[in-house]
Amino acid sequence: MQSVLVLDFGSQYTQLIARRIRELGIYSEILPYNTTPETIREHAPKAIILSGGPTSVYGESAILPHEGIFSLGLPILGICYGLQAIAKHFGGEVASSAKQEFGRAKMLVSRDGEPESMLFRNIPDSDVWMSHGDKVVNLPDGFRITASSANSEMCALETYGSKGALKVFGLQFHPEVQHTLYGKQLLSNFLIDIAGITPDWSPKHFIDHQIEEIRRTAGDETVICGISGGVDSSVAAVLVSRAIGKNLHCVFVDNGLLRKNEADKVMQFLKHLGLRLTLADASELFLKRLKNVASPEKKRKIIGRTFIQVFEEQLDKEKFLVQGTLYPDVIESVSVKGPSETIKSHHNVGGLPKRMKLKLIEPLRELFKDEVRAVGRELGIAEDILMRHPFPGPGLAVRVLGSVSKERLDILRDADEIFLEELKSSGLYQKVWQAFSVLLPVQSVGVMGDKRTYENVLALRAVESSDGMTADWAQLPHDFLARVSNRIINEVRGINRVAYDISSKPPATIEWE
């Protein structure tokens, strides 16, 4: 299988680059920015992409690629910081820009060069997405300018003439972001036309590869899988089951942090998947350990440790634990020296105890949510399971802000059920990426039945997204929001005020904690 390597310099969009490549039917892998030429040869890619990053190539904290990658004879595309790293390597000059560019910009393609740039073939002047404070101010020898913007004369560069055979390209903007109108076409031009890659990556190919990997990892050992009934754990369980059959033991943990009637619903449809399944009711244990804990990070750590303990109590001879960890989980959990900061530890990653007795199998670790659903369809999983909204591993513990109690959980469950019920009955549930309620650690004064009340404030959250990496708040109809608010205040005891969250990601995250 032909592949592309993305070298990560810490951009928040690195995972999006990988996703856009896969949308073209090409397999992609992400490796650290300082990966050696020897390691790259072992992966045998057909092309290399250098991601963006938050540092300056001329600063003391500059992180630069291994110089040997430019001697491998592979086509290379640098994006934003990647462009600047290329310019520096080949003797160009990068400096701080007097006017920074963040957001949309108009890109003008240079048409007077000979021969025509293969990278910009069939690409008109159009909007692109910028996010930079530095820019190339002196062109490296052997390069030409192929596009410009109002603030970046050298918006795109490429080798030509005697250096043309190197096939090194750079873009100051981000083709992987949806706001760049022809970004996907640019990537296609680079990977298919310039690098000569034949698209051959698909959900079926991924499944076949993972089945081989799982069998090689697990061997004849038995494996335990914590399953929640959500998309990720369900697809992970079925995929592992395809690989090792009855050697997979699934455990559904009722942690007391689930949505209303969730345990019964989950057990019903999981049995239809033909999995060997055990129910472990540990709700009292979780709530006891979470008592008076307000810190979201502490909640996640406690929940991660308790999950593992519960699994270990269900163990017979199992040596491995399956988790439905996805790419967005990893990028929000792992801080690489130099690149992007840790935003929050994820239940499936940073929340696990370091001295865990089980080895991990994470078959979905390199997939985005939409890819997980595509794999699930290939596996024959029912659509009503695949199209469920994402639900956090720590459950409602991170949607009850502040300390968690059974009383506050019940209030949130009742309110959240009304919100989801109204979304489904109004035909809006499948139009949003994720929707949920958050019980705030705030009380407000109200009046009900001529009496003063002092009760909880609830926030409603609904977002639109394609992968969870970025998200816009969903502009739900006002009459719909009014109906939901009215029902919650009148039907749920303990809430007298409802707010709607209109924050996008970034700067906010989708979940509040």
UniProtKB/Swiss-Prot annotation:
Which pathway is recorded for this entry? Purine metabolism; GMP biosynthesis; GMP from XMP (L-Gln route): step 1/1
Which PROSITE patterns does the entry link to?
GATASE_TYPE_1, GMPS_ATP_PPASE
Cellular component, GO annotation = cytosol
Q: Which residues form the active site?
A: 80, 174, 176
| UniProt-listed Enzyme Commission number(s) | 6.3.5.2
MF term (GO), any: GMP synthase activity
Entry keyword Plastid:
no
Q: Name one Pfam family in it.
A: NAD_synthase
Domain GMPS ATP-PPase, residue spans: 201-388
In this chain the Glutamine amidotransferase type-1 domain maps to 3-200
Origin: domain of life? Bacteria
Q: What residues bind ATP, as annotated?
A: 228-234
The reactions it catalyses are: XMP + L-glutamine + ATP + H2O = GMP + L-glutamate + AMP + diphosphate + 2 H(+)
Gene3D superfamilies linked: 3.30.300.10, 3.40.50.880, HUPs
Keywords in alphabetical order: ATP-binding, Glutamine amidotransferase, GMP biosynthesis, Ligase, Nucleotide-binding, Purine biosynthesis
Matching PANTHER family: GMP SYNTHASE [GLUTAMINE-HYDROLYZING], GMP SYNTHASE-RELATED
Q: What does this protein do?
A: Catalyzes the synthesis of GMP from XMP.
Q: How does it assemble?
A: Homodimer.
The protein here is known as: GMP synthase [glutamine-hydrolyzing]
User: From which source organism is this entry?
Assistant: Chlorobium limicola (strain DSM 245 / NBRC 103803 / 6330)
Q: State which gene encodes it.
A: guaA
